[in-house]
């Protein structure tokens, strides 16, 4: 593995947005989990990554010759308030490599130590939050949702002081890039239009090369990002995923999910579901995610206005027209996805829409577990109504809905291909992380195995398909910084 090479394209093309930096030395690095499948796809030798030299690479203490680790600069709106200088406070971009499919991928560290962007933070991360991101990001990938990936989590042997002293860790993350709406906001706030233009060109080359030859490639970039984000948010909604911190610095240009700090999956269906301990007003609630995405994209458009047209009024009109397509793309993706969840892919949309509206009201009024419902409904498509009927208190209302739905000829087998049995249920995640913090990785490994094969029911994993017991109570998440 001595021939591993990492490019420094971002640092080379956008030096104004990259600060060369080194990871802090990990005093006693110990590999906790390694993603063999991802390593293989990246052309990396998993056995070598498990070696002492490989583990040192995974925490950034040994980098290939020619690699240029950098902390990336970005700005962002955080809960609606603008911060002009955020950046990688506890992260480093080690560099880029080309995977087995010919795609350029970032190799990135999280929790690698204090950088010039750290502000008052220590730049470190604890084992629990890094394992959480590994678990949830790999579950999202298995669900078919665009996401950053997790290559490894390594315990550093360094204590991390939070409310108590915790074991430190580094997550090795892989992404199509770490370009964010906040990256463009940082470039724009400098007042350097050429920097914004070069950043846009970099984004086009990496993510949307098809627009490079368009009459207006920068407008094409914006339209492509709007479309990618519409598809992404729809996929979140279809599985009950609540991101929890949809700041503009956490919206990617690639259309991948990033930053799994306070995220969680909705249990009982409720559009007002919020898990994050710092989201006291519910800004990033489950049902608000589409509108927040549109708001973030409007902030992205603002950074690109000088590239759209020299005439500001015309530039604004172009941006508004392009942003207007986000809602149409989102509704189209959500409708198609819901039809698939109901086994009604071949049925005309107008016949399904009122049925779906009625169903969502029934789910909310009856406090029904979102994931369990759709999986049980697949059994009803095959004639076994009792599992899904057993979820409801208002049986008369649900039975009437069930008759209308079955009259449309749902496909139960198709439903099972899109409705998961296993998701990272909150009580199971906490159970696994608590055990891992005590040195027992077995619950984490079992849960990881379940959620990375989410659609196939397997013997011995029944408890991983069940909602949280009532005693688990109301769930709150924390960002882990």
From Swiss-Prot:
Obligatory cofactor(s): Mg(2+); Mn(2+)
EC class of the enzyme, as a word: transferase
GO MF, one annotated term: ATP binding
Keyword hit for Heme: no
Active site, renumbered: 249 (proton acceptor)
Entry keyword set: ATP-binding, Magnesium, Manganese, Metal-binding, Nucleotide-binding, Nucleotidyltransferase, Transferase
EC number: 2.7.7.-, 2.7.7.108
Chain sites annotated for binding ATP: 87, 89-90, 110, 122-123, 173, 180, 259
Pfam families in the record: SelO
Positions that bind Mg(2+): 250, 259
InterPro entries per the UniProt record, alphabetical: SelO
Catalytic activity: L-seryl-[protein] + ATP = 3-O-(5'-adenylyl)-L-seryl-[protein] + diphosphate; L-threonyl-[protein] + ATP = 3-O-(5'-adenylyl)-L-threonyl-[protein] + diphosphate; L-tyrosyl-[protein] + ATP = O-(5'-adenylyl)-L-tyrosyl-[protein] + diphosphate; L-histidyl-[protein] + UTP = N(tele)-(5'-uridylyl)-L-histidyl-[protein] + diphosphate
Record family assignment: Belongs to the SELO family.
NCBIfam families from the UniProt entry: PRK00029.1
Function: Nucleotidyltransferase involved in the post-translational modification of proteins. It can catalyze the addition of adenosine monophosphate (AMP) or uridine monophosphate (UMP) to a protein, resulting in modifications known as AMPylation and UMPylation.
Name assigned to this protein: Protein nucleotidyltransferase YdiU
Organism, scientific name: Mycobacterium sp. (strain KMS)
């Amino acid at each position: 593995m001595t021939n591993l090479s990492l490019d420094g394209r971002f640092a080379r093309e956008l030096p104004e947005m990259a600060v060369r930096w080194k990871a802090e030395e990990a005093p006693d690095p110990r590999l906790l989990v390694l993603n063999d499948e991802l390593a293989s796809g990246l052309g990396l030798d998993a056995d070598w990554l498990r070696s002492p030299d490989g583990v040192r690479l995974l925490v950034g203490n040994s980098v290939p010759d020619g690699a240029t680790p950098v902390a990336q600069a970005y700005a962002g709106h955080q809960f609606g308030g603008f911060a002009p200088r955020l950046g990688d406070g506890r992260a480093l971009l080690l560099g880029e490599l080309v995977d087995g499919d010919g795609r350029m991928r970032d190799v990135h560290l999280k929790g690698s130590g204090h950088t010039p962007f750290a502000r008052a933070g220590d730049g470190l991360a604890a084992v629990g939050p890094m394992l959480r991101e590994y678990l949830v990001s790999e579950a999202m990938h298995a669900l078919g949702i665009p996401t950053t990936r997790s290559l490894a989590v390594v315990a550093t042997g360094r204590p991390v002081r939070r409310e108590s002293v915790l074991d430190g860790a580094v997550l090795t993350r892989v992404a199509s890039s770490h370009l964010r709406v906040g990256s463009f906001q940082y470039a724009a706030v400098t007042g350097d239009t050429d920097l914004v233009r070069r950043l846009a060109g970099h984004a086009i080359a990496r993510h949307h090369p098809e627009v490079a030859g368009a009459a207006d490639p920068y407008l094409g970039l914006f339209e492509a990002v709007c479309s990618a984000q519409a598809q992404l948010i729809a996929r979140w909604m279809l599985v009950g995923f609540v991101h929890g911190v949809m700041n503009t610095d956490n919206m990617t240009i690639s259309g991948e999910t990033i930053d799994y700090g306070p995220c969680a999956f909705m249990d009982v269906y409720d559009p007002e579901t919020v898990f994050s301990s710092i989201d006291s007003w519910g800004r990033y609630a489950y049902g608000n995610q589409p509108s927040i995405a549109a708001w973030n994209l409007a902030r992205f458009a603002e950074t690109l206005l000088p590239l759209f047209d020299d005439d500001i009024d015309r530039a604004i009109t172009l941006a508004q027209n392009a942003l207007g397509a986000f809602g149409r793309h989102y509704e189209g993706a959500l409708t198609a996805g819901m039809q698939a969840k109901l086994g009604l892919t071949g049925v005309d949309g107008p016949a399904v829409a009122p049925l779906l509206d009625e169903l969502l009201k029934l789910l909310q009024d009856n406090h029904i577990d979102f994931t369990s419902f759709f999986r049980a409904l697949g059994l009803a498509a095959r004639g076994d109504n009792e599992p899904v009927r057993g979820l409801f208190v208002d049986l008369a209302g649900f039975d009437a809905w069930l008759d209308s739905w079955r009259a449309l000829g749902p496909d139960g087998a198709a439903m099972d291909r899109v409705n998961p049995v296993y998701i990272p249920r909150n009580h199971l995640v906490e159970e696994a992380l608590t055990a891992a913090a005590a040195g027992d990785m077995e619950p984490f490994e079992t849960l990881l195995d379940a959620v990375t094969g989410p659609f196939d029911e397997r013997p011995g994993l029944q408890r991983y398909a069940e909602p949280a017991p009532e005693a688990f109570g109301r769930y709150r998440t924390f960002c882990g910084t």
